[in-house]
C-alpha cells in the first residue's frame, strides 16, 4: 500500500484543472486512464506480493479462482460484445420503451415554454374540470353515506377537540370549493376570450369573402351584358337571313322574255307585301324579352339596415322610381322633368330617357321594358335592352371627367353620354285627357289611371286602347243599385285637392284593383268592365296598393296601412303611423312604406315587428337631418328609396 502511495505521488498529471479549461480534454483522459491502470494492477497483482495484507491476499485468491471458471468467462465476454441498446431491451419491455420515448421531452423544447401568468396550476385545473358529487349522485355509495351521516349526527360538545377538528375540516373543504370555483371562473373567462378571438377572426374572413363575392358578381354582370349584346346581334343577323331567304324563295328566276311580258310594275307583289303598311300599329312587332340569367345574392349576406349605396340622382323631388332586380337597372323620375336609368351594380347613370314634355308621375320596369306615365297625358313604352352601355366603361376613361358613380350624395349628378338611349323608345299611347297618375302592366296588358277620372286598358301587342272604365259612373251605379258602399265620398283629407283621383292600381290577368281619392278600393273584372267588390275602410285618399294570391295591402293619406283578405273582403290586419303614407311595397317578408319621415318604415310580417331603415338613423349620429322619403321599392330584401332632395339610397332590409 505504501508503494501505491508513492506511485500516486509521482504522477505529474494529477493536478487540479483550472475553471477555464474544458471539462473533457486530452490531458484529463490520459490522467484518468493511468489512474485506472494503476488501480487495476494493484487490485489484480501478484498474490505473493509481501507488501499486501494477508486478508487481501486471501480475498484475491478466491476471486482468481472464480474468474478462472469457463462459465463466468463466457458470460463476461458476452456482456462485452453486447451493445447498450441490446442491454436496455433485455431489461425493459417494448411497452415500457415506447412509454419512455413518448413521455420524454428534450430540454430544448422545455426552454421554449412561455411563462404563464395564471396563478392556478395544471393539477388545479384538472381538479376543477370534475363536477361536484352530491348526495343524490352517489347512489353507489348510499350505505357508506348513511353510515357517515349517522356517525356525524352523534352529539358533540361545542368546546371539545372533536368539534374544533370538525369545524377546521369543514372550513378546509369550503376553502377548497371556493378555490375550485375561482379556477372554474378563470377557465370560463379564458374560454370566452378564446371565443371572442375566433369570432373576430371569422368576421375578418367573412369580410374577405364578401369582397370576393362582390367582385364575382361584378364580373358576372359584365359577362351577362356581353352575352345579351351577342344575343341581340345574333337575333338581328337571323332576321336578316330569314328575310333574305324568304325573298329569294318568293322571287322566281325569270328570263328576259318573261320580264318583257310582265305587266306588273318594276317591283313584284312579294316586295310590296314586305313593305310596312301605313296603318301598322307601332306595337305590332314586340322586341325580344331579355331575362336575367343570374340573380345577385350579395345583399342577402348584409345585416338588415345596411346602406349599400347613396346617389344624387336628381336636383329636385323624386316623383317615381322602380328597379327590376337587386343590383340591376333602376329608373328614377323627378320634378325636373328628367327620367334617368341607373346601373345599381356600379352606381352609374346609363342614360336619360327623352320624349315626355312634362314630369313623369308614375313608372314601372319589368324584364327590360319600361312604361312611363307623365303629366302630358301620354304613356311611353321603352326597351332598355337597346341602351348603348358598357359596364366597364369607367375603367378606360378619366375618372374626373367620365366617372358617373356618386359615392357622396352631395355631389351633383353628371350627365350621361348623349345618345346612349336613342334606340330605347318603342311607341306612345295617347288617349287620356289629363295627367297619368297610376299605371301597371303585366304581359301584353297595361292599365292606366288618369286625373280625367277614367281607367284605360291597353293592348301592348296592337298598341291601342281596348277598354275605358269610368270610375264616377261605377260609383253612381253602385248608388243606384242600393249598394252599402254609398255614393262617391269626399273625404276630409282630400279637401285641398292635392291627392290624385286614381292613386294606385294593379292588374293581374283579368283582375284589377284600383284605389281612389274617396278612400275606397274597387276590384274590377276586365272581362265585364264591372266592379264586383268594393273595400271600404280608409278615411283618406288611397295612394298605394299591392296584392298577391291571398292579401291586398293598401296605404292612404289617413296614415294607415290596411291588409285585406281577398277571399272574404274583410280587414286582416291594420296599423298606422304619424304621417300620411305616400308609397308602399311588400315582398315575401316585409312591408315597407314612406310615411313622411326621413326613414323608411318597415314591418316584418313574420316576426310582427316594426323598425326603421334609412339615412335618418345613420345621419342622426352625425347631427345631420336628411330629406323626407317620398318613394320606396323593395325586392327580395333589396330596398331603394327616393327623397325630396333628389337623393336615392340603396339598403338591405
Curated annotation (Swiss-Prot):
UniProt-listed InterPro entries: G-protein_beta_WD-40_rep, WD40/YVTN_repeat-like_dom_sf, WD40_repeat_CS, WD40_repeat_dom_sf, WD40_rpt
Main location class: mitochondrion
Compositional bias of kind Basic and acidic residues: 254-264
Region annotation Disordered: where it falls in the sequence: 246-265
Coiled coil regions, renumbered to chain: 207-251
Cited Pfam families: WD40
Entry keywords, A to Z: Coiled coil, Membrane, Mitochondrion, Mitochondrion outer membrane, Repeat, WD repeat
Entry's Gene Ontology cellular component terms: mitochondrial outer membrane; mitochondrion; transferase complex
Location in or out of the cell: Mitochondrion outer membrane
SMART domains linked to this entry: WD40 (SM00320)
Bilayer topology annotation: Peripheral membrane protein
GO biological process: mitochondrial fission; peroxisome fission
Chain positions of WD repeats: 313-354, 355-392, 431-470, 491-534, 537-576, 578-613, 618-653
SUPFAM superfamilies given in the database record: WD40 repeat-like (SSF50978)
UniProt function note: Involved in mitochondrial fission. Acts as an adapter protein required to form mitochondrial fission complexes. Formation of these complexes is required to promote constriction and fission of the mitochondrial compartment at a late step in mitochondrial division.
Family the UniProt entry places it in: Belongs to the WD repeat MDV1/CAF4 family.
PANTHER family: WD REPEAT DOMAIN 5B, WD40 REPEAT PROTEIN
Record-given protein name: Mitochondrial division protein 1
Originating species: Neurospora crassa (strain ATCC 24698 / 74-OR23-1A / CBS 708.71 / DSM 1257 / FGSC 987)
Gene: mdv1
Amino acid at each position: 500500500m505504501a508503494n501505491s502511495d508513492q506511485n500516486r505521488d509521482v504522477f505529474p498529471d494529477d493536478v487540479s484543472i483550472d475553471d477555464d479549461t474544458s471539462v473533457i480534454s486530452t490531458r484529463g483522459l490520459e490522467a484518468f486512464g493511468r489512474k485506472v491502470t494503476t488501480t487495476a494492477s494493484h487490485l489484480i497483482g501478484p498474490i505473493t506480493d509481501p507488501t499486501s495484507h494477508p486478508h487481501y491476499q486471501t480475498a484475491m485468491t478466491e476471486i482468481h479462482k472464480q474468474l478462472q471458471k469457463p462459465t463466468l468467462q463466457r458470460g463476461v465476454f458476452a456482456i462485452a460484445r453486447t451493445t447498450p441498446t441490446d442491454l436496455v431491451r433485455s431489461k425493459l419491455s417494448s411497452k415500457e420503451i415506447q412509454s419512455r420515448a413518448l413521455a420524454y421531452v428534450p430540454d430544448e423544447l422545455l426552454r421554449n415554454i412561455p411563462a404563464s401568468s395564471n396563478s392556478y396550476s395544471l393539477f388545479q385545473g384538472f381538479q376543477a374540470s370534475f363536477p361536484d358529487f352530491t348526495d343524490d349522485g352517489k347512489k353507489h355509495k348510499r350505505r357508506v353515506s348513511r353510515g357517515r351521516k349517522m356517525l356525524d349526527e352523534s352529539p358533540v360538545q361545542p368546546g371539545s377537540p372533536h368539534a374544533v377538528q370538525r369545524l377546521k375540516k369543514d372550513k378546509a373543504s369550503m376553502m377548497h370549493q371556493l378555490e375550485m370555483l375561482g379556477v372554474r371562473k378563470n377557465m370560463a373567462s379564458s374560454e370566452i376570450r378564446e371565443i371572442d378571438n375566433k369570432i373576430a377572426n371569422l368576421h375578418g374572413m367573412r369580410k374577405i369573402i364578401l369582397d370576393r363575392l362582390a367582385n364575382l358578381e361584378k364580373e358576372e354582370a359584365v359577362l351577362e351584358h356581353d352575352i345579351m349584346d351577342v344575343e341581340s346581334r345574333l337575333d338581328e343577323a337571323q332576321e336578316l337571313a330569314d328575310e333574305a331567304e324568304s325573298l329569294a324563295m318568293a322571287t322566281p328566276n325569270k328570263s328576259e322574255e318573261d320580264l318583257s311580258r310582265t305587266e306588273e310594275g318594276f317591283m313584284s307583289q312579294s316586295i310590296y307585301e314586305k313593305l310596312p303598311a301605313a296603318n301598322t300599329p307601332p306595337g305590332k312587332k314586340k322586341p325580344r324579352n331579355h331575362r336575367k340569367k343570374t340573380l345577385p345574392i350579395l345583399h342577402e349576406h348584409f345585416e338588415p339596415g345596411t346602406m349599400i349605396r347613396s346617389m344624387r340622382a336628381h336636383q329636385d323631388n323624386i316623383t317615381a322610381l322602380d328597379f327590376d332586380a337587386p343590383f340591376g337597372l333602376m329608373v328614377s323620375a323627378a320634378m325636373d322633368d328628367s327620367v334617368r336609368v341607373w346601373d345599381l351594380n356600379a352606381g352609374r347613370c346609363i342614360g336619360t330617357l327623352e320624349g315626355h314634355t312634362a314630369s313623369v308621375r308614375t313608372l314601372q320596369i319589368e324584364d327590360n321594358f319600361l312604361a312611363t306615365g307623365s303629366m302630358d297625358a301620354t304613356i311611353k313604352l321603352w326597351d332598355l335592352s337597346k341602351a348603348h352601355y358598357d359596364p366597364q366603361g369607367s375603367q378606360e376613361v378619366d375618372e374626373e371627367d367620365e366617372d358617373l358613380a356618386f359615392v357622396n350624395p352631395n355631389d351633383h349628378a353628371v350627365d350621361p353620354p348623349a345618345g346612349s338611349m336613342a334606340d330605347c323608345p318603342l311607341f306612345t299611347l295617347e288617349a287620356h285627357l289629363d295627367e297619368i297618375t297610376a299605371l301597371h302592366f303585366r304581359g301584353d296588358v297595361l292599365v292606366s289611371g288618369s286625373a280625367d277620372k277614367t281607367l284605360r286598358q291597353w293592348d301592348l301587342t296592337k298598341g291601342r286602347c281596348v277598354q275605358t272604365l269610368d270610375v264616377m259612373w261605377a260609383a253612381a251605379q253602385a248608388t243606384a243599385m242600393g249598394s252599402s258602399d254609398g255614393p262617391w265620398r269626399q273625404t276630409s283629407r282630400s279637401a285641398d285637392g292635392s291627392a290624385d283621383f286614381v292613386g294606385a292600381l294593379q292588374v293581374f290577368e283579368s283582375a284589377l284593383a284600383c284605389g281612389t281619392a274617396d278612400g275606397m278600393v274597387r276590384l274590377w273584372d276586365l272581362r265585364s268592365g264591372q266592379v264586383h267588390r268594393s273595400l271600404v275602410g280608409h278615411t283618406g285618399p288611397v295612394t298605394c296598393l299591392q296584392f298577391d294570391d291571398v292579401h291586398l295591402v293598401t296605404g292612404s293619406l289617413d296614415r294607415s296601412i290596411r291588409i285585406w283578405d281577398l277571399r272574404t273582403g274583410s280587414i286582416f290586419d291594420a296599423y298606422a303611423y304619424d304621417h300620411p303614407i305616400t308609397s308602399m311595397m311588400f315582398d315575401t317578408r316585409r312591408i315597407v312604406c314612406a310615411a313622411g319621415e326621413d326613414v323608411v318604415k318597415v314591418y316584418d310580417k313574420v316576426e310582427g315587428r316594426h323598425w326603421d331603415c334609412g339615412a335618418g338613423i345613420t345621419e342622426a349620429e352625425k347631427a345631420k337631418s336628411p330629406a323626407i322619403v317620398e318613394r320606396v321599392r323593395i325586392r327580395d330584401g333589396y330596398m331603394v328609396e327616393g327623397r325630396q332632395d333628389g337623393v336615392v339610397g340603396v339598403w338591405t332590409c
